[in-house]
A protein has these predicted regions:
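Alpha-helical transmembrane segments and their immediate juxtamembrane cytosolic regions
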Residues: 2-368
Length: 368
C-alpha cells in the first residue's frame, strides 16, 4: 500500500535537510561554529525521529506495529537505502580519486587516502570515523538507518516488547557514559555504534505517532477545534529548542558533531538534540499550509535523499571557488540555498531517467 504523507512531516524534512547542508557549508573553526553545528546535529535528529514516527505506517490504518514481513522490510531497505548508498558511494569514490588531491590541497591539507581501492573498501565498511569516507561522509546516515530500522523491527516483534523498548531507550545513555569514562571509541561496520546512540530518537518518534494521528488536521495545515491548545504545545517545543541552544552556548560547547564520541559535553547531547528536533517539528507547522513557501519546503522534504547524497559536490565546489571568503552565517546560508537548488535540478533530471538512484520506483519518481 502507498505510504501516507502528512504536510507537517514533509515540511520538517525540508527544514531539517537545509540545516544539515548549512552545517556542512560552515567552517568548523569559524566564529559561528556552535550555532551551525547545532543546526546540523539537530537536523539529523529530526530524520531519526521521523523515521520512527513513519516506520511501517500505511494508508487506512495507524498501527503501533503492523507485523510487516521481514522480506518486505528487507526489500524496502535495499531499494530506499542500501542501493542508493552503493550507487552514490561508487560515484563519490571515483570523483574523489580524480579531484580529491586538488580539493584537499586547497581546503584540508591533512586529508589523505585518495586511492580508489582503499576507499571502495571503506565504502563496504561504511563508517565515517574510519578515515576512508572522506569522499562523501554524509552517506553514513543511510547505512546507520538500516541498522536502526532492523534493530527496532526485531524489537517490536518480540513478545517482551515493553521491556525491550525500555532497554532500547536507556542503553545508549549507559553506552555513552562508559565510552566517555574509558575513552574507548568503537568504529563498527555501517555505523553500528552510532545506530545504538540514536535508538532513543527513533523510539521517541514511535511515541510521536499517536500525537500525529490525533492531530492529523494540524499536520496538514487545517484548522481544527483544539487549535489554541496545539499552538501552545508547538510554541513550547520551539522555546525548548531555543533553550537547548542557549544551554550549549552557556556551557561553552565547542564541538557539536552528531556523533556522540566527538561531542565534548555528553550532558548536552541527548537533551539538546531531542529538544532541537522537536523544535524543528514545531516550526514546520508554519509551512504545512497551502502557501507558496510551504509548498516549496514540502517539495524539498519529499526529496531529501537526493539532497543528502549529492550536496557534497556543490558545497565543495563553492568552497573552492570562495576559499578566500569571509566567514558568516549569511554566506553559508547562500551556499546552502545554491547547493539545495542544484541538487533539486539534478534530481529532477535523474528521476526521469533512472529513479532507482534515489530509491524510487518508476511509477512514483516524484517523491521518496
Amino acid at each position: 500500500m502507498k505510504q501516507k504523507r502528512l504536510n507537517g512531516i514533509d515540511a520538517a524534512k525540508g527544514l531539517a535537510i537545509m540545516m544539515v547542508v548549512l552545517g556542512h557549508c560552515a567552517d568548523k573553526n569559524g566564529p559561528d561554529r556552535v550555532l551551525l553545528h547545532f543546526s546540523m546535529f539537530t537536523g539529523v535528529g529530526v530524520f531519526f525521529l521521523l523515521s520512527g514516527a513513519t516506520f511501517c505506517w500505511r494508508d487506512g490504518t495507524f498501527p503501533w506495529f503492523d507485523q510487516r514481513p521481514f522480506r518486505s522490510l528487507a526489500k524496502s531497505l535495499w531499494r530506499s537505502l542500501i542501493l542508493p548508498y552503493f550507487i552514490w558511494g561508487s560515484i563519490s569514490v571515483a570523483i574523489y580519486g580524480l579531484l580529491g588531491k586538488y580539493a584537499a590541497a586547497e581546503l584540508s591539507p591533512d586529508r589523505h587516502h585518495f586511492d580508489i581501492g582503499p576507499n571502495l573498501l571503506g565504502m563496504l565498511y561504511g563508517n565515517s570515523g574510519s578515515g576512508f569516507m572522506e569522499w562523501n561522509r554524509p552517506l553514513w546516515f543511510l547505512v546507520c538507518l538500516v541498522w536502526v530500522e532492523l534493530i527496532w523491527y526485531f524489537l517490536l516483534r518480540s513478545s517482551r516488547v515493553k521491556w525491550l523498548y525500555l532497554c532500547a531507550m536507556t542503553l545508549p545513555f549507559v553506552w555513552l557514559s562508559v565510552q566517555n569514562r574509558t575513552d574507548i571509541h568503537l568504529c563498527l561496520p555501517w555505523e553500528l555504534e552510532t545506530a545504538i546512540c540514536v535508538l532513543p530518537y527513533f523510539g521517541a518518534g514511535r511515541l510521536l505517532r499517536s500525537y500525529a494521528v490525533r492531530r492529523e488536521g494540524h499536520w496538514n495545515g487545517e484548522k481544527t477545534r483544539d487549535g489554541g491548545k496545539t499552538i501552545s504545545v508547538l510554541l513550547a517545543l520551539a522555546g525548548a529548542a531555543a533553550l537547548a541552544l542557549l544551554w550549549m552556548l552557556l556551557k561553552g560547547v565547542q564541538d557539536a558533531d552528531f556523533r556522540a564520541d566527538r561531542f565534548t559535553d555528553l550532558s548536552c547531547f541527548f537533551p539538546d538534540m531531542l529538544l532541537g528536533a522537536f523544535g524543528i517539528l514545531a516550526v514546520s507547522q508554519l509551512f504545512s499550509g497551502m502557501d507558496q513557501m510551504g509548498k516549496w519546503i514540502r517539495y524539498l522534504g519529499q526529496r531529501t535523499l537526493a539532497v543528502l547524497v549529492m550536496h557534497k559536490f556543490p558545497v565543495m565546489a563553492m568552497k573552492l571557488l570562495l576559499r578566500n571568503r569571509r566567514e558568516s552565517i549569511l554566506t553559508d546560508a547562500g551556499m546552502m540555498i545554491v547547493s539545495v537548488l542544484l541538487c533539486l535540478l539534478v534530481e529532477r533530471i535523474l528521476s526521469r531517467i533512472c529513479p532507482a538512484v534515489f530509491g524510487k520506483r518508476k511509477r512514483s519518481c516524484g517523491r521518496e
